[in-house]
Regions:
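Walker B catalytic acidic pair
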Residues: 81
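Active-site-proximal or metal-binding-adjacent scaffold patches in catalytic folds
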Residues: 1-76, 85-117
Length: 117
């Protein structure tokens, strides 16, 4: 699909692009999300939801919209959420939009993607 046409989110697309950007940005060190949901989200383009159970086990769930204005918007959102997963799961960071998060900006620019809040 063209990067300027509306993009329909699919599990297959999420998994394929996750693998692509995991190799390009994280040297294949980023673990998969524990679960993925395609759903309507109010006030966000995507999000990582994490829960901690009594066992102190953490679960990281990726939530993506069913449809994006463009494929590029889908890709930027997916990579944005992958960076949050990296912060929390690999670096034990807060997952906020901080220096670690924005440290990926140059890499994304090189790949033709924008990194924003």
């Amino acid at each position: 699909p063209s990067t300027q046409q509306p993009y329909q989110t699919t599990m297959h697309g999420i998994h394929d692009w996750f693998d692509h950007y995991n190799a390009a940005l994280f040297e294949n060190k980023l673990p998969n999300f524990d679960d993925i949901k395609i759903k309507r989200i109010h006030g966000a383009l995507g999000q990582v939801v994490y829960t901690t159970y009594k066992t102190r086990e953490q679960k990281f769930v990726l939530e993506m919209l069913p449809r994006y204005e463009t494929k590029k918007m889908f890709l930027e959102t997916l990579v944005h959420e992958m960076i949050h997963l990296y912060q929390m799961k690999i670096k034990n960071d807060t997952g906020n939009h901080n220096k670690l998060f924005f440290g990926f900006r140059k890499k994304l620019n090189f790949l033709g993607l924008r990194l924003s809040r």
